[in-house]
């Protein structure tokens, strides 16, 4: 009889262990500040519960990046000709902010990335990419325009000129990629010996409107969301070259509002957000060949501009700008399904979430 009950007991213990898996960390949140937000917030994330810990004043810090040692947080200032990059001292153990500094450069940067000892910004209105040096003290300074573009696309409203929306370093750290929503292309910059130089251009279908992209954990595939087409493209990455291999619909309403995209930590699922109508997050399962298949859709509050998956993959947290709320979803690792937990944190115009790891 002991052998009969041993397997169920082990299964019950394993299930209980899964339920008790703990995730406690600190998040930081960037915002738009026209409607009363203070700037950048630190938030305690405790097994799906959210509590504001601290904040620091900033003007439209709409995208954030963290130094490797988490001692500094960098944020764009998306403010027309007054744009640039903030550097905030930060204590990752407590979630408290210290001194802040500002370096001017760019026109409405909407994204930034750390590339070695530089910070690179994607300037939406300027149609350009800027770079800032990171000093020995961790402070961003000496900003300059690295490359400017003047392309266009078939959408007479959204694609009159180039709009650089996102920059990301490839997994092998040999290239920096920059999406141009206005000209339907991805620029590839060679990264070598501390220099970043334009190398090649991948032209996409007219009207695709490339916005954000993310690589699979193994670095073999890249997933690109088209804000204007409402599609997600799978690209193969090999020896510095991106090759499109498949496209799948993300926004069935075709309202030209697709937003953010992220891959689960295990690489089995891809999530992409839609805005402007039928707001929500599309769930895709990843096939063996890296292509995607649609397995679900989860409604969200209005305008999920940005979202993040928790480090252990148990939760997805969405920043819903127009409803001034951050919402938490439990994530089933086996099926990819998202389920609202009921946890909501009211915050004015949240638009960027990052975990402090």
Region locations from a protein language model:
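Bacterial Sec-dependent N-terminal signal peptides
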Residues: 1-25
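Short loop/turn segments immediately following the C-termini of beta-strands
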Residues: 32-34, 78-80, 124-126, 134, ...
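Short loop/turn segments immediately following beta-strands, especially the blade-tip
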Residues: 43-48, 88-95, 132-141, 189-195, ...
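Loop/turn-rich, solvent-exposed surfaces of beta-rich toroidal or solenoidal domains
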Residues: 257-321
